[in-house]
C-alpha cells in the first residue's frame, strides 16, 4: 500500500521553505557576488538559484524522502538536519473547514513537486528584481493541486522595489478544491484599465510567433515582462487578461505553482491549442513545447483568436 501525506502539511512546509528561499536570494543579491554561470545562451544560473534549490529539496527530503521532486537546476542535494514546519496551516479556519478529507491522505506515488528556486534569473542578474520569485507547485495525478509563490523583493504593498529598506516579501498560496480561498492576492487592476484587453508576454524572448499572437489578440495594452511566474501573477491579480507565450521556452517548474493558484481563482492554463498541460517527471515532457496561454476568464475566446489568425 502506498504511503500517504496530508496536503496541508506539505503545503505548510513548502510555504516556509519558499520564504526561507527568499532570504537566501536576498542575501546573495546584497552580497554583490552572484556567481553567474551560463547554462545556455541567454539562460543564466546564479549561486542563489543553486542554494535555494538545495535548501528546498534537502529540507523536504527530511520528511518525505520518497516523494518525486523536479527542480530546475542540476545540482547535488546536501543532507539537511532541520525539518521544515508542517503545522503552519493547522489553525487556519478556511483549511480546517474546507479542505477535503481525501486531501489529508493523498498517495505519495501520485504527487510531484515542481520547484523553480529563482524565477526570472536573467532579470535578477541585471538588478531588475521586482519580478523575481520562488515558485513551488504540487501536482496530483498530473494536475496542479497546490501552489506557492514567494516574492523576495516587494514592499508592504506587494510592489517590486530595489530599496532594500522596504523589502518585506510576499507569500501567495492556494490549494485547489474545496473552496479554500487563495491567500496573499488582491485585485490590482488600475481604474484606467477597466474595460481594456491587456496582454502580457515575454520581454527577453520576443520573436515572430509571439508577435503573431499579439497581432491575433489585438490588445489595448501590451505588458512585456520577465519571469513566467511574474506574468502569471499579472493575470491572477487582474493586471492582465491574458498571458501568451506560443513557443518553446517555459518548463513545468515555471507554471505548476502559478497554475494551481490560477485554478483556485477560476482561471485557466493550456497550450495555445487549448490542450491541457499534464504534469509528469518524463524528461521529454518537462518543456511546454507548444507554449502556453493563461487567462482569468474568456479562455476559449483567446484560443479561437489564435486559431483563426493562424488559419
Curated annotation (Swiss-Prot):
Catalytic residues (positions): 49 (proton acceptor), 121 (proton acceptor)
InterPro entries cross-referenced by the UniProt entry: CysQ/Inositol_MonoPase (IPR050725), Inositol_monophosphatase-like (IPR000760), Inositol_monophosphatase_CS (IPR020550)
Job of this protein: Phosphatase that converts 3'(2')-phosphoadenosine 5'-phosphate (PAP) to AMP and adenosine 3'-phosphate 5'-phosphosulfate (PAPS) to adenosine 5'-phosphosulfate (APS). Is also able to hydrolyze inositol 1,4-bisphosphate (Ins(1,4)P2) and inositol 1,3,4-trisphosphate (Ins(1,3,4)P3), but is not active on AMP, 3'-AMP, fructose-1,6-bisphosphate, Ins(1)P, Ins(2)P and Ins(1,4,5)P3. Probably prevents the toxic accumulation of PAP, a compound which inhibits a variety of proteins, including PAPS-utilizing enzymes such as sulfotransferases, and RNA processing enzymes.
Protein family per UniProt: Belongs to the inositol monophosphatase superfamily.
Binding site for AMP: 202, 205, 227, 231
Gene Ontology MF terms in the entry: 3'(2'),5'-bisphosphate nucleotidase activity; inositol-1,4-bisphosphate 1-phosphatase activity; metal ion binding
Binding site for Mg(2+) 1: 72, 116, 118
Source taxonomy: Eukaryota, Amoebozoa, Evosea, Eumycetozoa, Dictyostelia
Swiss-Prot/TrEMBL cofactor(s): Mg(2+)
Activity regulation text: Inhibited by Li(+) and Ca(2+), but not by Na(+).
Reactions catalysed, as given in the entry: adenosine 3',5'-bisphosphate + H2O = AMP + phosphate; adenosine 2',5'-bisphosphate + H2O = AMP + phosphate; 3'-phosphoadenylyl sulfate + H2O = adenosine 5'-phosphosulfate + phosphate; 1D-myo-inositol 1,4-bisphosphate + H2O = 1D-myo-inositol 4-phosphate + phosphate
A single BP term in Gene Ontology: phosphatidylinositol phosphate biosynthetic process
Binding site for Mg(2+) 2: 116, 119, 254
Residues reported to bind Mg(2+) 3: 72
Gene3D superfamilies linked to this entry: 3.40.190.80, Fructose-1,6-Bisphosphatase, subunit A, domain 1
EC top class named in words: hydrolase
Organism expressing this protein natively: Dictyostelium discoideum (Social amoeba)
This protein's name: 3'(2'),5'-bisphosphate nucleotidase 1
Record's keyword annotation contains Signal: no
EC number: 3.1.3.7, 3.1.3.57
Keywords, comma-separated and alphabetical: Hydrolase, Lithium, Magnesium, Metal-binding
